[in-house]
Swiss-Prot record:
The gene is eIF3i. One of its GO terms (molecular function) is translation initiation factor activity. This is Eukaryotic translation initiation factor 3 subunit I. Keywords: Cytoplasm, Initiation factor, Protein biosynthesis, Repeat, WD repeat. Its main location: cytoplasm.
Length: 326
């Protein structure tokens, strides 16, 4: 299970994401330049140069034609995946924290930070005929977030809803057509939600939180189904597309990290059984907290991005597929 070490960023990784086929792996970091890699051998195919601040989020559409990024330079950009050119750049009033394409690829959503006297806002834009004039057009929908800022986001089924995770541990579902909240979970986490990822069929999602837990939720009712407990903040969590497995990654805040933390196993990727909530494996590798995790769409490998600036792609041994959890 020898990993691929992808070294192309000068600062810590903020998010990693596979495209639908899994042949491309996209990574964003605080060094202003998102990268795209060939996931099979770790070759860097290119960079997307244009942001002037830390890039906090990215997403690639269903056909791997467009890439959306959000950054601390108060812009969200739409890119041509193949040529690396900027299709459109949209200015915002504060940093862009999350961005996602809808399943159809017709729309994209992004949210801004609660900072500099500005409230957090959720925006939805139409990207079907996106060009440079997109920055001058009004968004399809704008929803102000009065209570707590959005820290993670996913589209619901049929592009009808958006699921948001918040800084206060709250989760909500919003109707895209009406711009109204339709389901509110209350405060499910005792601290902020760092990450949220859907299962392959979109019926469930897993959240990663600063309260040292990851939780599995029903995507329609927001009922909490399972809880995976650790001893330190969880920065990211992902659900395997082929097994009932969840992988968790995290660690202390970067400012609290010491050299002894690596030896203590604080930066391992931790595997839990989806149903039994039991940890069954750990994988070492990063020299700092893990900030983002993603399973390959075929379930035979996974990738992790860390505070150390490395992206690691781990392929599973044959024993992983042979050993059935009992």
């Amino acid at each position: 299970m020898r990993p691929l070490m992808l070294q192309g960023h000068e600062r810590s990784i903020t998010q990693i994401k596979y495209n639908r086929e899994g042949d491309l792996l996209f990574s964003s970091s605080k060094d202003q330049k998102p990268n795209v890699w060939y996931s099979l051998n770790g070759e860097r195919l290119g960079t997307y140069d244009g942001h002037q601040g830390a890039v906090w989020c990215l997403d690639v559409d269903w056909e791997s034609r467009k890439l959306i990024t959000g950054a601390g330079d108060m812009t969200t950009k739409l890119w041509d995946v193949e040529y690396g050119t900027v299709i459109a750049s949209i200015a915002t009033k504060s940093s862009v924290r999350t961005s996602n394409f809808s399943f159809s690829g017709n729309q994209a959503a992004y949210s801004t930070d609660k900072a500099m006297g500005q409230n957090c806002e959720l925006f939805i834009i139409d990207v079907r005929n996106a060009d440079s004039t997109l920055s001058e057009q009004e968004p399809t929908l704008r929803i102000p977030m009065v209570e707590s800022k959005i820290t993670s986001m996913q589209w619901g089924p049929l592009d009808e809803t958006i699921i948001t995770g918040h800084d206060n541990g709250n989760i909500a579902i919003w109707d895209v057509r009406k711009g109204q909240k339709v389901v509110d979970s209350g405060v499910d986490h005792a601290a902020g939600i760092n990450d949220m990822q859907l299962s392959k069929d979109g019926t469930m999602f897993v959240t990663a939180s600063k309260d040292n837990t990851a939780k599995l939720f029903d995507a329609e009712s927001l009922m909490c189904l399972k809880t995976y407990k650790t001893e330190r903040p969880v920065n990211s969590a992902a659900i395997s597309p082929i097994f009932d497995h969840v992988v968790l990654g995290g660690g202390q805040d970067a400012m609290e990290v010491t050299t002894t933390s690596t030896k203590a196993g604080k930066f391992d990727s931790r595997f839990f059984h989806l149903i039994y909530e039991e940890e069954f494996a750990r994988l070492k590798g990063h020299f700092g907290p893990i900030n983002s995790l993603a399973f390959h769409p075929d379930g035979k490998s996974y990738a992790s991005g860390g505070e150390d600036g490395f992206v690691r792609v781990q392929s599973f041994d044959s024993t992983y597929f042979e050993n059935i959890f009992e």
